[in-house]
Amino acid sequence: MKGAMEPEPEVLLQEARENVEAAQSYRRELGQRLQGLREAQRQIKESASQTRDVLKQHFSDLKGTLGKLLDERLVTLLQEVDTIEQETIKPLDDCQKLIEHGVNTADDLVREGEIAILGGIEEESDKLWNFTKKASHIQLDSLPEVPLLVDVPCLSAQLDDSILNIVKDHIFKHGTVASRPPVQIEELIEKPGGIIVRWCKVDDDFTAQDYRLQFRKCTANHFEDVYVGSETEFIVLHIDPNVDYQFRVCARGDGRQEWSPWSVPQTGHSTLVPHEWTTGFEGYSLSSRRNIALRNDAESSGVLYSSAPTYFCGQTLTFRVETVGQPDRRDSIGVCAERQNGYESLQRDQAVCISTNGAVFVNGKEMTNQLPAVTSGSTVTFDIEAVTLGTSNSHEGGNAKLRVTISSNNREVVFDWLLEQACGPLYFGCSFFYPGWKVLVF
């Protein structure tokens, strides 16, 4: 018989199954951590190998350049020696030729005189006369001046041995090895058709003057610059949905020209559908990605809406005015609950908008508070949060209340927007009565 305290077989079987599941889950978790550990080890080894190669190549190039510079300097100094030697030796060579000519003349005169003297007065009187006459024509008391040694160049080389200490000090301080880059990507935030990239310094001793952000599709071979500046946040636009992109950032130290090492690349993607304008509207020309609308010269009026209700509460909708045309008080940029044709502006019911003169309209009524006028380069943002969502049945009191914040040119207005029905995704739109206005939405 079984012991009184022994569990039933069904209980034991259930516990065994639970233990197996727990062990499998534990094994999966350990496997994931092991994979992460291997990636970390690979990053250390690969970055160390790359750093060794960079150091070897750099110092090899440096030695070659320094050797070339020293050789060029040596050639220059030797040419200076040659020039001084040639210019200062020529007068002395000329003087030497003159003296040697005088010596030869004196030798000839001595020989002729000795012969004439040996011949006697009576026998060689003609020779004596000719010798005396010849000697009188030679200035035997005229001697060329030979410069003193202190008056002629004495070449030497002046070499400052302290350059060795200076070069040595610079070489000993040249280059550093860092265990990690001074900046790292901190956060990737998906946006419709874009990704916000935020980065931060991780080296407190590094003073950054500028940052440089690059990105690429994970299937591409090369990164490309997308931002250079002093900000620590940038939105990368023209991002295809559900496509992985890699981002990396580096920095330039204060007063320096060279860039720091790149941060560890971070991978991100956006699952949000890009905001697009409706195609086929006669009064507007669209970009290839349909996120930029240009009011053209066509004599057409009405509101250009988004192709679908792609704005959801809790997101930030941004309009950037690229170029401007002539303003009109009926112009509008904003959001609405539904597309309604036949209206020339979003200054109507079930819509909130800002006009190009800065006036704010809620359900067609102008607010007392006003924002600055829209100019070229202005950015207008809409942040909408649901206060009460309402219901889909109007007889149950289905009004929805939304908290709307419109920001432009460092000013903002906040108000509640009442809708007649439950809040779902919203449309956005714009209307301009004169050509030249170009608006990017993201």
Swiss-Prot record:
Keywords: Coiled coil, Cytoplasm. The keyword GTP-binding does not apply. The keyword Cytoplasm applies. GO terms for molecular function: identical protein binding. It is found in: Cytoplasm. Residues 10-46 form a coiled coil. GO terms for biological process: negative regulation of cell growth; negative regulation of G1/S transition of mitotic cell cycle; positive regulation of DNA-templated transcription; positive regulation of receptor signaling pathway via JAK-STAT; positive regulation of transcription by RNA polymerase II. Gene3D superfamilies: Immunoglobulins. Transmembrane segments: none annotated. GO terms for cellular component: cytoplasm; cytosol; plasma membrane. Signal peptide: none annotated. Residues 181-274 form the Fibronectin type-III domain. Its main location: cytoplasm. CDD domains: FN3. Belongs to the cytokine receptor-like factor 3 family. May play a role in the negative regulation of cell cycle progression. This is Cytokine receptor-like factor 3.
